């Protein structure tokens, strides 16, 4: 029984050291205007990107995010096409990376700007994250 308790305590300690994902508590959502999407549609897309960042960008802090804009957004329609979707929305963000380098694919102690988030949906449904990066 003592071994089981010791094992459970050790497991609890290890789990407490595991990161909780990206930090989004102070993210600035920059104002945007669109003739293509409503404010609610854009906010829903931003929420999807923030949720993904929270889960997958351990050691990173999202500092700003916004809608790319109608004119540039249309250039990304191929993502909707290849994902059998009708709509695409592109967000742009900035985030800081701590000394850990996130998951190892990012430069430690750096800031990423103009980072794109590409989301698609079909016929006004829910946005789905399909890609991100430069």
Label each residue range with its predicted role.
Residues 19-111:
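Flexible low-complexity loop/turn motifs enriched in small/helix-breaking residues
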Residues 8-11, 28, 110, 118:
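Residue-level signal for the start and early helices of compact helical domains
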Residues 3, 16, 90, 99-101, ...:
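Low-complexity, compositionally biased segments
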């Amino acid at each position: 029984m003592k071994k089981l308790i010791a094992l459970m305590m050790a497991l609890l300690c290890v789990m407490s050291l595991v990161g909780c994902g990206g930090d989004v508590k102070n993210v600035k959502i920059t104002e945007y205007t669109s003739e293509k999407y409503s404010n609610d549609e854009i906010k829903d897309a931003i929420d999807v990107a923030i949720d993904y960042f929270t889960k997958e960008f351990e050691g990173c802090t999202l500092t700003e995010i916004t809608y790319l804009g109608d004119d540039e957004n249309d250039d990304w329609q191929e993502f909707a096409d290849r994902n059998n979707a009708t709509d695409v929305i592109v967000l742009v963000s900035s985030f800081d990376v701590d000394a850990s380098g996130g998951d190892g694919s990012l430069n430690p102690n750096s800031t990423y700007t103009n980072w794109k988030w590409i989301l698609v949906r079909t016929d006004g449904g829910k946005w789905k994250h399909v890609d991100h990066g430069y």
